[in-house]
């Protein structure tokens, strides 16, 4: 039975001033939910993709001054980390919930991954129109897939391939006003539906 529901208090964590104060609130309100989602969806990915996936809850351990503007749990088939691999994420900015598949700049094979995506761009374009794409995991901004189909999607994938800092994220952004109204069951279903739509894209990325 799904247990996790997002509240306004969860989103307000990212408006609290001060590193220590925000981290305390994050640890109290948000991280336990990421831990539970980590358990639930690592089992989902392991089952769906046929290899063991591990959850990685963001620790923000390197921060000494600036409080985190977002936080997340990531999923990858590697116990010691996820940033060098294509990975799935569930996370929050103060404005929205994000449910995405990500390739970030630390992935050493991202040029190969980008070529695979370019070769199957039509499959990406068949995803639901309420999906978004982004070229920067450090920014809350994104472009709707419906708009990106024109030329932005190709531009992003070429940048992913050719530019060292190029990144690619795809999935859903759910405004906090909508996310906080979802029941635990509705939220779980939406998250699972989003990831199910992204599984074929993940398989393309990893060459399956």
Where are these regions (language model features)?
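Charge-rich, low-complexity N-terminal segments
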Residues: 1-98
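Long, solvent-exposed, polar/charged low-complexity segments
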Residues: 1-46, 142-208
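Short glycine-rich, low-complexity/disordered patches
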Residues: 40-57, 126-140, 204-208
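Sequence-level motif detector for i,i+2 pairs with an aromatic at +2
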Residues: 68-70, 128, 165
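Short small-residue beta-strand/loop micro-motif enriched in glycine and branched aliphatics
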Residues: 98-101, 179-180
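Compact, glycine/acidic-enriched structural inserts
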Residues: 101-153
């Amino acid at each position: 039975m799904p247990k996790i529901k997002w509240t306004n208090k969860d989103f307000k964590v990212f408006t609290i001033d001060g590193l220590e104060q925000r981290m305390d609130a994050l640890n109290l309100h948000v991280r336990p939910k990421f831990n539970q989602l980590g358990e639930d969806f690592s089992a989902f990915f392991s089952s769906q993709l046929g290899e063991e996936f591990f959850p990685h809850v963001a620790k923000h351990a390197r921060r000494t001054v600036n409080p985190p503007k977002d936080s997340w749990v990531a999923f990858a088939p590697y116990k010691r980390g996820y940033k060098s691999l294509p990975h799935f994420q569930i996370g929050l900015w103060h404005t929205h919930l994000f449910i995405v598949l990500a390739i970030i700049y630390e992935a050493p094979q991202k040029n190969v991954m980008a070529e695979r995506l370019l070769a199957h761009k039509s499959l990406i374009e068949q995803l639901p129109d309420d999906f978004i794409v982004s070229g920067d995991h450090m920014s809350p901004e994104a472009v709707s897939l419906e708009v990106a189909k024109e030329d932005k999607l190709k531009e992003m994938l070429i940048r992913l391939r050719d530019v060292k800092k190029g990144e690619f994220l795809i999935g859903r952004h759910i405004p906090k006003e909508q996310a906080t109204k979802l029941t635990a069951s509705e939220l779980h279903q939406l998250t699972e539906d989003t990831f199910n739509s992204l599984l074929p894209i993940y398989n393309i990325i990893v060459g399956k």
